[in-house]
Swiss-Prot record:
This protein's name: Membrane-bound lytic murein transglycosylase F
PROSITE patterns in the cross-refs: TRANSGLYCOSYLASE (PS00922)
Region of interest (LT domain), ranges: 268-485
One cellular component term from this protein's GO annotations in UniProt: cell outer membrane
PANTHER family on file: MEMBRANE-BOUND LYTIC MUREIN TRANSGLYCOSYLASE F
Assigned keywords, A-Z: Cell outer membrane, Cell wall biogenesis/degradation, Lyase, Membrane, Signal
Amino acid sequence: MFAHTALRQRCAKWLLATGLFLLLGACVEKPSTLERVKEDGVLRVITRNSPATYFQDRNGETGFEYELVQHFADDLGVKLQIETADNLDELYDALGKPSGPVLAAAGLVSSERRKTQVKYSHPYLEVTPQVIYRNGRARPTGAKGLVGKKIMVLKGSSHADQLAELKKQYPALQYEESDAVEVVDLLRMVDEGQIDLTLVDSNELAMNQVYFPNVRVAFDLGDTRDQRWAVAAGEDNSLLNEINEFLDKAQKNGTLQRLKDRYYGHVDVLGYVGAYTFAQHLQQRLPKYEKHFKSYAKVEQVDWRLLAAIGYQESMWQPEVTSKTGVRGLMMLTQRTAQAMGVSNRLDPRQSIQGGAKYFMKIKEELDDSIQEPDRTWFALAAYNVGSGHLEDARTLAKREKLNPNKWLDVKKMLPRLAQKQWYRQTKYGYARGGEPVHFVANIRRYYDILTWVTQPQLEGQVAEGNLHVPGVNKDKPADKSSPM
């Protein structure tokens, strides 16, 4: 009997101890989302691969959302890890996965149907949804004018939600939601007449309209709306609270305004300005820097007129120019490139030309040996503009299309595809403004042709005297087609 009682007492003590252990274990709190991020040392973010959010150019990762979320990661003292989603449904779904990203920064607008999936942050950018049509076609002036039109929008977007609401009022309204396109694709399709209308936010139109001369705003569809970041609905509020504090601070300290100005507040004044203006600048600007072009061209063994043409395309031979993306100087060098090339002052025209010459030849020497002149020069120019990685992506696409990846004539057909989702999703480096390097190379070739022609000994005096005839303006004076090598 005593043994039985002692056994029961030991069992009771064991059960009590076990219960206390389990109870204490239950009282130990799991780390919050914010604590997990800091412990891991990585902020995992999912976004869209597009000009207004995130993409890679010759200078590395860039985009409005990328820069803003990089500031947030820096504030947390952690590394930023970017993932991209092919479409909005994939983006929202990824947030709900245990091993997925903890934050979506993708130009999102609060959506009622998404509120079971995510919690939205404080706003950081105000945008207006706009109906886009092709210039020369009938312009719809209101919602009723959308009926009978071929309309396409991003699948799962707030624009699709708007059209769904309008369809209740106008049952005949038809539209297509696509997860195979991005905003750039939609604008291109309107520009080329493949679809009648699309809906985009005002910030994305502002960034891309220069590349699509036929697109116009028909009307604003509703009031302005706010873009926000998002976290999974099932997560605690620790990270969301930190995000809101950061965004509020960025609004007050000018960080947001600086990013808005960089990406949306400027008109790109560089580029082709006409042969007459170029002729004026030959006489007024080039003489100040010609000796530097010649000096460093000799060092790097490149035609000085090609270097001068690059300089004109980049800055119109203005040594103090600064672009919206932070590249500076006559040759428009990034800070990183300048440091790598030994340039301490990008606004010093001599140093800028030296760095630009060195950088161009470095790119050219790194190209595949199978690329021969004159294509090698055009490839190097394209890489100078868009980055070597994207150039290789275009060459890969050329191979798949059974074109010659070593010929500029073929590769330049592929570069614009890097701005189209159906193509860039197949590439290593993703989205790029692929049309830009095509125009970049074409402009430089024209400037080079003119420089080659006017620097013939018998014509150099005409430049100094202002009696210059420019090829393309005066048809009786064809440009010399000498190679730039």
